[in-house]
């Protein structure tokens, strides 16, 4: 049997951290077993779908390096890959369930359903159980009501059964059929509900293993019921634990203190491979506690048995550490492929070399680029106050000896060292006066590099009065 996994988002929002991790674990599992990873779009709820939701899902998965073998647009025997293109299939199968006695029409209006709920609450039943009254009506009455076209189709749950599965993450899980209400499989608008459509899709696409969030645990017995009604083989399920913030609370899209969507991290310029690596460790560990993996080694190492049963903490500092580590080891030319700087390639290369070790993301390069691309016209009051208290001798010597004709980093650096030896000073006493006079700030990269990057025209103008 070929391993086939899937990630099946709804285009009701952009790719969330939790969804990305679900996609990644399904992808890693499939690739570890030389299987296929499928991207399917669950777009049956038109009222909630947003513009570019599907596009965001696909583009950000590709940015992460999670490449589907099949996706919307693929021409295979398993498609189509959007639920909105399979409505006839769902409706046909729902009719089959009715014929087999596993489903039935229900004609309740909202008021009648609310009355049922109130009556059950009064009896101490707080988890709604549908009363199956419509199973008792005559065929004549049923046909009459069907003409009005106001009905849903409900699945008839076998109350005598226990619905059990051996969860790939959590072990044996069981639900009593008596605790599950007869649930809607086809809504009044003719569209399938999630729990019905997802089973049909997984069967049609021959999905063998499903890793998903723990919020789907309560959906699983309903889905198993559908598989059993059709006598279809049930895939293996694994339910992942939640991802939490620093306070131990589940990540919420409403929490503005942390970016929740992959697009945010992409736009900030985080290293995609670093994010891929970091995401894999949110709920999975390698046997030897290794943390750095390239794409291929992570696929090779992935073992679902090492998926955590405890919640995973989204540590932004750890992500920053990963991204910084990846960027620091990249070839300079690869970094430059991701940046748009000046027209001077020699300057660009020196600039990247200067800030490579300190940059967490590509946005950090741009932030530093602004300092040199749009240099200050004068020293601000705070810096001026610091500068006035310093000995100006290092500045005067530097201004008189700097070689503008042969603008060279090594010569600038050697001159600074020479001044230190001549005045018998080091550290802040040597560097701070020159730094403030040349860069108009008291911090930054190595001084000689900052001076070279600012360029001889700007430095000559700033040092003119100190000659």
Curated annotation (Swiss-Prot):
Entry GO MF terms: ATP binding; glutamate-tRNA ligase activity; tRNA binding; zinc ion binding
Alphabetical list of InterPro entries matching this protein: aa-tRNA-synth_I_cd-bd (IPR045462), aa-tRNA-synth_I_codon-bd_sub2 (IPR020751), aa-tRNA-synth_I_CS (IPR001412), aa_tRNA-synth_I_cd-bd_sf (IPR008925), Glu-tRNA-ligase_bac/mito (IPR004527), Glu/Gln-tRNA-synth (IPR000924), Glu/Gln-tRNA-synth_Ib_cat-dom (IPR020058), GluQ/Sye (IPR049940)
Cellular component, GO annotation: cytosol
Source organism of the structure: Mesomycoplasma hyopneumoniae (strain 232)
Keywords: Aminoacyl-tRNA synthetase, ATP-binding, Cytoplasm, Ligase, Nucleotide-binding, Protein biosynthesis
GN (gene name): gltX
EC numbers, comma separated: 6.1.1.17
Family, per entry: Belongs to the class-I aminoacyl-tRNA synthetase family. Glutamate--tRNA ligase type 1 subfamily.
PROSITE patterns from the UniProt entry: AA_TRNA_LIGASE_I
Superkingdom classification of source: Bacteria
Catalytic function, reaction form: tRNA(Glu) + L-glutamate + ATP = L-glutamyl-tRNA(Glu) + AMP + diphosphate
Protein name from the UniProt record: Glutamate--tRNA ligase
Span of the annotated motif 'HIGH' region: 9-19
Key word Thylakoid present: no
Matching PANTHER family: GLUTAMATE--TRNA LIGASE, GLUTAMATE--TRNA LIGASE, MITOCHONDRIAL-RELATED
Role according to the record: Catalyzes the attachment of glutamate to tRNA(Glu) in a two-step reaction: glutamate is first activated by ATP to form Glu-AMP and then transferred to the acceptor end of tRNA(Glu).
Chain ranges for the short sequence motif 'KMSKS' region as given in the UniProt record: 250-254
Positions bound to ATP: 253
GO biological process, one term: glutamyl-tRNA aminoacylation
Subcellular location(s) of the protein: Cytoplasm
Entry annotated with the keyword Aminoacyl-tRNA synthetase: yes
